[in-house]
């Protein structure tokens, strides 16, 4: 949800609602402490779409932390968002995914998380009925092992049949 504050100044004066779908404890906190007419919090995409019409789905540093990223994305695409933005996501050039352990630097806090490095080719096959408008480097890297840095990438997709 922190992307909202990064882009809020660009949205000033526009009739935009930014809806965040998050884990339940973040939703509760957001609804109680941060929610405004422009910023809303929901537990599921369906809960959000029941209240708000959404033109854009933004997935920023999300998919790699989901237990089943392909299933989640397949389900999300059934809603035919006019545009889908994938950002800050690690992809491999391989035809298979890699499950890795992300270690948070101790200067931030001591933790480790399972994370996916998704096959870019396999991931792009999900976007049937969408056109890829752009691919971009997010200028962040993901460290694997001691030396290997994997760039975080992004993509912008447009639905060919959205109304």
Name these PLM-found stretches:
Residues 110-138, 150, 154:
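Short alpha-helix
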Residues 65-81, 86:
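A short, conserved alpha-helix within the catalytic core of class I
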Residues 1-48:
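Class I SAM-dependent methyltransferase SAM/SAH-binding core
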